[in-house]
Amino acid sequence: MDAQCSAKVNARKRRKEAPGPNGATEEDGVPSKVQRCAVGLRQPAPFSDEIEVDFSKPYVRVTMEEASRGTPCERPVRVYADGIFDLFHSGHARALMQAKNLFPNTYLIVGVCSDELTHNFKGFTVMNENERYDAVQHCRYVDEVVRNAPWTLTPEFLAEHRIDFVAHDDIPYSSAGSDDVYKHIKEAGMFAPTQRTEGISTSDIITRIVRDYDVYARRNLQRGYTAKELNVSFINEKKYHLQERVDKVKKKVKDVEEKSKEFVQKVEEKSIDLIQKWEEKSREFIGSFLEMFGPEGALKHMLKEGKGRMLQAISPKQSPSSSPTRERSPSPSFRWPFSGKTSPPCSPANLSRHKAAAYDISEDEED
């Protein structure tokens, strides 16, 4: 422990004395950025048969308690995770991430089974073994890849790769002649469980492709793949081309329908606006008409005023009588104002005309 503490102190001193980007150190008041050594993030993980291992050095497996507490930098905990990794997806990456983070100092070794083993024990794969090796190599959490990994882990394989723990989800993985291929690993105390990611798996991806096979076949035919490459018969090829043309016609009809709906909607909006404006103008017109020609309109008042003025002009006002009980005696003759002479007597014809005019004036007054 003392040696480990002294190594940490020396490492801190080296970090402080390390020059910064401009040649300055932390002691000069300018914090320096130490570049991390992240080979796994810059290059693909190496294959196990390309790494030279010094088997002369003794190897002692660490316990779970020691691994959880932390190990020295030169002695990482070697964790092994295996699988098929066909159509490498986020579920695979999450499982490897969990295996990498099981302990503070972990060296993750990933085994990938060959095509022969996989086809015999599990079934046909979409990707061949080289494609699957390459996919796992480029996962950021992987430190080493084992090609042609065994289906069942043997003590010799564990010793050869100096494996401390095996990481896998704790669901029993059955195989030919065994209910759980990790049973002996669990009994030896070397099993480190991880959690399976729900909703994503290679089988689910293949199911989606099979379910929508016609869609993907038509898409690849459009992109230049031949019917022979897609293993599509002549009749199905013509059917897919016909469906594609029908879909194009449907799309055009749908576009026209949408545009016509938009046009009709705009026309309706415009018509509603015009109707509203027409109603407003009609109300204004009716109101103006009633104000002018209605029962109490301005025209009737004008006619009444004109009629009254005409009546005043035609018949002047009579002077009040001297006595209300005394009746005025008809004058025998008409006298011109400002003259002392009496007018001559009226002829019978003139007298009848005067009576008729007086009768008309009296009728107008009664009206």
Curated annotation (Swiss-Prot):
Isomerase as UniProt keyword: no
PTM info: The serine residues of the C-terminus are phosphorylated. The inactive soluble form is stabilized by phosphorylation, the active membrane bound form is promoted by anionic lipids or diacylglycerol, and is stabilized by dephosphorylation.
Enzyme class: transferase
Effect seen on changing residue 93 to T: Decreased solubility. Decreased lipid vesicle-dependent choline-phosphate cytidylyltransferase activity. 4-fold decreased Vmax. No effect on affinity for phosphocholine and CTP
Effect of residue 223 to S: In SMDCRD; no effect on solubility; decreased lipid vesicle-dependent choline-phosphate cytidylyltransferase activity; 4-fold decreased Vmax; 3.5-fold decreased affinity for phosphocholine; 3-fold decreased affinity for CTP
Database matches in SUPFAM superfamilies: Nucleotidylyl transferase (SSF52374)
Chain positions recorded as phosphocholine binding sites: 122, 151
Membrane topology: Peripheral membrane protein
Mutagenesis or variant effect for residue 99 to V: In SMDCRD; decreased solubility; decreased lipid vesicle-dependent choline-phosphate cytidylyltransferase activity; 2-fold decreased Vmax; 3.5-fold decreased affinity for phosphocholine; 5-fold decreased affinity for CTP
GO cellular component: a single term: cytosol
Region Autoinhibitory (AI), annotated ranges: 272-293
Residue positions binding CTP: 84-85, 92, 122, 168-169, 173, 195-197, 200
Disulfide bonds: none
Location (main, coarse): cytoplasm
Domain of life, per lineage: Eukaryota
Pathway assigned in UniProt: Phospholipid metabolism; phosphatidylcholine biosynthesis; phosphatidylcholine from phosphocholine: step 1/2
Regulation: Interconverts between an inactive cytosolic form and an active membrane-bound form. Activation involves disruption of an inhibitory interaction between helices at the base of the active site and the autoinhibitory (AI) region. Activated by anionic lipid vesicles and by oleic acid or diacylglycerol-containing phosphatidylcholine vesicles.
Keyword terms, alphabetized: Acetylation, Cone-rod dystrophy, Congenital generalized lipodystrophy, Cytoplasm, Diabetes mellitus, Disease variant, Dwarfism, Endoplasmic reticulum, Lipid biosynthesis, Lipid metabolism, Membrane, Nucleotidyltransferase, Nucleus, Phospholipid biosynthesis, Phospholipid metabolism, Phosphoprotein, Repeat, Transferase, Ubl conjugation
Catalysed reactions, as listed in the record: phosphocholine + CTP + H(+) = CDP-choline + diphosphate
Subcellular location: Cytoplasm, Cytosol; Membrane; Endoplasmic reticulum membrane; Nucleus
Tissue/organ expression: Brain, placenta, liver, fetal and adult lung.
Function: Catalyzes the key rate-limiting step in the CDP-choline pathway for phosphatidylcholine biosynthesis.
The protein's name: Choline-phosphate cytidylyltransferase A
Gene: PCYT1A
